Amino acid sequence: MKRLLVTGAAGQLGRVMRERLAPMAEILRLADLSPLDPAGPNEECVQCDLADANAVNAMVAGCDGIVHLGGISVEKPFEQILQGNIIGLYNLYEAARAHGQPRIVFASSNHTIGYYPQTERLGPDVPARPDGLYGVSKCFGENLARMYFDKFGQETALVRIGSCTPEPNNYRMLSTWFSHDDFVSLIEAVFRAPVLGCPVVWGASANDAGWWDNSHLGFLGWKPKDNAEAFRRHITETTPPPDPNDALVRFQGGTFVDNPIFKQS
């Protein structure tokens, strides 16, 4: 494609995707509220507050695809989540509607379903069970995206990211790990598909201990290749076994279920 927008490009995952997604477009437009490293060849850097509708409109203009990693990615006071994940996402979808409806990869989260027990295997249509205000904001985001698809035909992949890290490093991640390579191959598949719609995609690698069923995604032609099982021995040898009553091994959202409702100081 001509120009691919990556929001949240200064974040931990955004910095990884900056390098990995460069071959997908002639120009990579990188955006974040935080300062970005200087633009390299075939890059554009934009400092943008998602809560500023005019800034978001300018950020989206001229883009042929969007990978939306921006916003708040952990549990925070509602006032912060509201600006980045609710107002900000509305601004993004309005900007996309005004600029030809480029296809969107929306970084949703496993915390939309965090209160499900780890004993359950989940398909894409299970009712939401968010484990905090962050998870609630991602439920909002998924529903906003579905409304824009039904009303305007805006296509979005709703990627419920598990644990997108270089390697799994705890027992829960043996089920939730999503390798960087598998995320990149998913993004490639989303933009390659002739028709996308607005599907839920469980953002996880091909983990033997996985809880999530992506069998509905045959039309994408995407198959994750990595498997957290390769790291099980290292985890068991270096990590004390968790208490069976610990949220880390009881709930799919892990310790997020233990978070309080944080208040703005």
Swiss-Prot record:
InterPro entries: Epimerase_deHydtase, NAD(P)-bd_dom_sf. This is Uronate dehydrogenase. Substrate binds at S73, S109, N110, H111, S163, R172. Homohexamer. Its EC number is 1.1.1.203. Optimum pH is 8. Induction: By D-galacturonate. Belongs to the NAD(P)-dependent epimerase/dehydratase family. Pathway: Carbohydrate acid metabolism; D-galacturonate degradation via prokaryotic oxidative pathway. It catalyses: beta-D-galacturonate + NAD(+) = D-galactaro-1,5-lactone + NADH + H(+); beta-D-glucuronate + NAD(+) = D-glucaro-1,5-lactone + NADH + H(+). Activity increases with increasing temperatures between 4 and 42 degrees Celsius. Activity remains near 80% of the maximum after exposure at 37 degrees Celsius for 30 minutes. The active site is at Y134 (proton acceptor). The keyword Endoplasmic reticulum does not apply. Pfam families: Epimerase (PF01370). It comes from Agrobacterium fabrum (strain C58 / ATCC 33970). Catalyzes the oxidation of D-galacturonate and D-glucuronate to galactarate and D-glucarate, respectively. In fact, in water solution the substrate D-galacturonate is predominantly in pyranosic form whose beta anomer is converted by the enzyme to D-galactaro-1,5-lactone; in solution, this reaction product rearranges to the more stable D-galactaro-1,4-lactone. Makes part of the oxidative degradation pathway of D-galacturonate, which allows A.tumefaciens to utilize D-galacturonate as a sole carbon source. Cannot use NADP(+) instead of NAD(+) as cosubstrate. Gene3D superfamilies: NAD(P)-binding Rossmann-like Domain. NAD(+) binds at Q12, L13, D32, L33, S34, D49, L50, L69, G70, G71, I72, S73, K138, C164. The lineage of its organism: Bacteria, Pseudomonadati, Pseudomonadota, Alphaproteobacteria, Hyphomicrobiales. Signal peptide: none annotated. One of its GO terms (molecular function) is nucleotide binding. D-galactaro-1,4-lactone was previously believed to be the product of the reaction of D-galacturonate oxidation. The keyword Oxidoreductase applies.
